[in-house]
Regions:
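Short beta-strand elements
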Residues: 390-407
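Glycoside hydrolase catalytic-domain context in secreted enzymes
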Residues: 1-365, 374-390, 407-813
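Extracellular/periplasmic metallocenter environments
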Residues: 371
């Protein structure tokens, strides 16, 4: 059989474009001046991540790239001589033993939960094992690479081997730091690890998970060919310092008692100790910020400051602007990020004037009593710095009276608790800081028309009830049952694609959708015959799931995902896609231009393979470091999240016929029983924290699609919430695209839970356009809803019209 395995031009270009900017996603947490190294040398390399390098998380976030450069490979390719390889042989033996026991227990747990083992196993990760192996390798320098992986379907635990370091890791890291003059602790992780036992280590690099060139990027950093310039988008602290979340593991209800005090808003306001604060990050070089100048033109605020490289190596710095608001009727965090900007690469001695801007209405607080966004009278302190812990007062903006910036309405339900509130604290004006008067009349109150007229296309109006309903359900096989009914028909036209919209209504185009927030996720190889395109091997399940299955089950999944092995003589075609950095790493760059270039990479590959909608980016908030899917998400801060999602969307949608699907809308901040868990969140916290990033992304980039989340919000499934979908998303944010559900809702909820799954008829009634990936049961449910009056045929045709218009726009009819 002929196999076209030579790397395609797009692969080479994309990998080259990525690698030169990857150091910008990494965060130098500690340094003593002993790095970078002058040249490749003999390097003692320890830790699971040297050989088992993690490029990204598990689940829908996995990307089928042609290869990954491990840290071992990247260092060897850069000319290093690695020692300590016998350590890895011993580690693999310890890991294999632990993994067998892990799988055995997993099968027992799936049976107890009455869940399909494949779906139950999604995201389940074995903790790092303990071991006792000698550290007898010599070298001019040494590294220890801590790796952690997490994923869709399961949350992290505060146990050793996950959020906490194992005893073995702590012992070896401290021993190596003592033994070697030049030692670097490298963190190949997607989320926070409690580093409190090893804070004495002199050099720590958060490498993160950078996609295909993860190993090469580390080699560049160790040799000084690239300089880390990332900043933390999540507060790193000892586990005990985070807000208590006693019901995080509750099957049915999750109460967001901390309200708006998420991440640094909590740590700063309540004076909690962070190991490394939000916005923090060092460089091989040093920078000095000049005195900031602040101007206000009505509600528009502009901040200018000069950044000078005072060190000996070229590098980049991130300027961060924070706003401290007066506490009046509403309590307020100590400070909130309101703008940021990254310098270009500055040579030693070079300086750049950086300009950041924001508007005061963007920083308004939500008053649930009056259902309005307000700016209260008082002083607003503008702070400028390089992290939330390193800011300098730059100006006081004084507002003479309270103003309303947007009159909304409460639509998200209520909770059975009162949000955490901050103690009242008077803000004193810093001496020597200019005071700028803000004219209240310059801030205009925005009003919203919630009674919007929706269009029904003539061709949709002419459809039968049955055909109109089909357009709201993903393409499904009416004869398939069980798991195959949802995923057995995925990717009819593009092998390995997640699924498609309905392709059986005459004269209506369909949309092809693909997963993979860290790149496009398609089948690696396929072939064509008279019956169509067929994936070679398994195209349905990520590698992280396949490794859990027995031999016979792997064969079954392979046959479902493709057609097994192709006949002799068939040409094997490839669909290798580029694995970009995980969402958190992208955000750590604080570089929206780079993120947009990553979107351009994805968009070009979508065009190349014929994919219309990318089921990404994901911009949920890092509410808790325990969320297993945080690696996909950008930050604990909504401004960072929204700006990054907008940049990614602009990059993708610059390509003809390509769109993003921003997700998961909203309050999807844990994975355990995610399809039937009720997030209980106040209207204020939802609007100021969990919805704000979506609003930024919609207003700045108009993504083609929005995906609702699995969970309920205050007792109503998000996909069934007309307040979320129509009132806030469409009316307040001005959204113009289509709304789909998250995928494979049936069969994924714990049978012991108190809440049901979302249903197609109620999703349609709320204004949801697509129930994905769809099966006959969902279709029948929608028809039943039309007949019972749960949803009107008019609403169904309104939703269907949006789907048809989007399909035409992206298929270029």
């Amino acid at each position: 059989m002929k196999n076209t395995t030579a790397m395609a031009d797009y692969e080479l270009r994309h990998i080259e474009a990525l690698r030169k900017d990857l150091a910008g996603c990494t965060v130098l947490l500690k340094k003593d001046g002993s790095f970078p190294l002058e040249k490749p040398c003999t390097l003692a390399a320890y830790g699971s991540g040297v050989r088992r390098t993690i490029r990204g998380g598990t689940g829908s976030g996995e990307v089928n790239s042609r290869y990954i450069v491990t840290i071992e490979e990247g260092l060897q390719q850069a000319g290093f001589t690695l020692t300590g390889m016998e350590w890895h042989t011993g580690y693999e033996q310890a890991r294999e033993k632990a993994h067998k026991a892990f799988l055995k227990q997993l099968k027992k747990d799936a049976k107890a939960a009455k869940q399909n083992f494949i779906l139950y196993g999604m995201g389940k990760v074995m903790p790092e094992p303990e071991y006792d192996l000698p550290l007898n390798a010599e070298g001019d320098a040494a590294i220890y690479v801590v790796s952690r992986i997490s994923g869709e379907g399961n949350d992290r635990t505060p146990l050793k081997g996950d959020i906490r370091l194992t005893d073995s890791e702590v012992r070896d890291i401290l021993a190596l730091d003592k033994k070697f003059t030049r030692f670097m602790l490298v963190l190949n992780v997607g989320g926070v690890v409690d580093l409190s036992p090893v804070m004495g280590v002199r050099n720590i690099l958060l490498l993160s998970q950078l996609g295909v060139e993860t190993g090469g990027a580390l080699a560049d950093i160790l040799l000084g060919k690239a300089n880390p310039s990332g900043k933390l988008t999540t507060t790193w602290a000892a586990f005990e310092e985070y807000p208590e979340m006693p019901d995080f593991e509750d099957m049915n209800e999750t109460r967001y008692r901390e309200g708006i005090y998420v991440g640094y808003r909590y740590f700063d306001t309540f004076r909690k100790k962070a190991l490394f604060p939000f916005g923090y990050g060092l460089s091989y070089t040093e920078f000095r910020l000049g005195t900031a100048e602040v101007e206000a033109n009505g509600a528009q605020v502009t901040v200018r400051t000069t950044v000078e490289n005072t060190g000996t190596m070229a590098g980049r710095q991130v300027v961060q602007v924070y706003l401290s608001k007066p506490a009046g009727k509403l309590d307020a965090p100590r400070q909130e990020l309101c703008a940021f900007a990254k310098t270009r690469t500055l040579a030693p001695g070079e300086a750049e004037t950086v300009i950041c801007s924001f508007t005061l209405p963007e920083m308004a607080a939500y008053d649930a009593e009056t259902a309005a966004y307000i700016l209260e009278t008082g002083d607003y302190l503008v702070r400028v710095g390089v992290s939330c812990a390193e800011t300098v007062p730059a100006a006081v903006l004084h507002l003479g009276k309270t103003v309303t910036t947007l009159q909304a309405k409460n639509v998200l339900g209520s909770t059975d608790f009162t949000d955490l509130t901050a103690p009242a604290a008077a803000m004193e004006r810093p001496e020597g800081v200019p005071v700028i008067e803000i004219d209240p009349a310059s801030i205009v109150c925005e009003t919203i028309d919630y009674a919007r007229t929706e269009e029904i296309l003539p061709e949709v109006n002419a459809l039968t009830k049955e055909d109109a309903a089909l357009l709201l359900i993903g393409d499904f096989d009416p004869n398939a049952k069980g798991l195959a009914s949802m995923i057995g028909t995925a990717g009819r036209h593009v092998c390995g694609a997640a699924g498609e919209s309905c392709s059986t209504v005459k004269g209506i185009s369909w949309l092809i959708m693909a997963d993979g927030p860290a790149g496009l996720r398609l089948a690696k190889e396929y072939y064509e015959d008279g019956k169509g395109k067929h994936a070679v091997g398994n195209a349905l399940m990520p590698d992280s799931i396949m490794e859990m299955l027995s031999g016979p089950m792997k064969l079954v999944m392979s046959l479902m995902g493709g057609n097994g092995k192709p006949k002799a003589g068939c040409e094997i075609k490839t669909q290798y896609c580029t694995a970009i950095p995980i969402g958190t790493a992208l955000a750590q760059s604080f570089d929206t231009d780079f993120v947009q270039r990553c979107g351009d990479i994805v968009g070009e590959e979508m065009e190349h393979f014929g994919v219309h909608l990318w089921l990404a980016p994901a911009l949920n908030i890092h509410r808790s470091i325990r969320c297993g899917r945080n690696f996909e998400y950008y930050s604990e801060d909504p401004l960072v999240s929204g700006k990054m999602a907008a940049a990614m969307t602009r990059g993708v949608q610059a390509h003809k016929g390509c769109g993003t699907t921003i997700k998961h809308y909203a309050a999807n901040n844990k994975e355990y029983n995610r399809t039937r868990n009720n997030s209980m969140v106040s209207e204020r916290a939802m609007r100021e924290i969990y919805l704000k990033g979506f609003g930024i992304c919609v207003r700045e980039s108009q993504p083609k699609a929005v995906m609702t989340s699995y969970n309920l919000l205050n007792g109503t499934h998000t996909a069934e919430s007309r307040g979320l979908v129509m009132d806030i998303l469409r009316a307040e944010f001005g959204y113009q695209g289509i709304v789909m559900t998250d995928w494979v809702t049936p069969m994924t909820g714990d049978a012991r839970s108190a809440h049901r799954d979302s249903q197609a008829q109620y999703v349609a009634a709320a204004g949801g356009d697509l129930f994905m990936p769809g099966n006959k049961g969902d279709y029948d449910n929608l028809l039943q809803g039309i007949d019972s009056g749960a949803v009107t045929l008019e609403q169904v045709k309104i939703n269907a019209s949006r789907v048809v218009k989007m399909a035409r726009a992206l298929t270029q009819e």
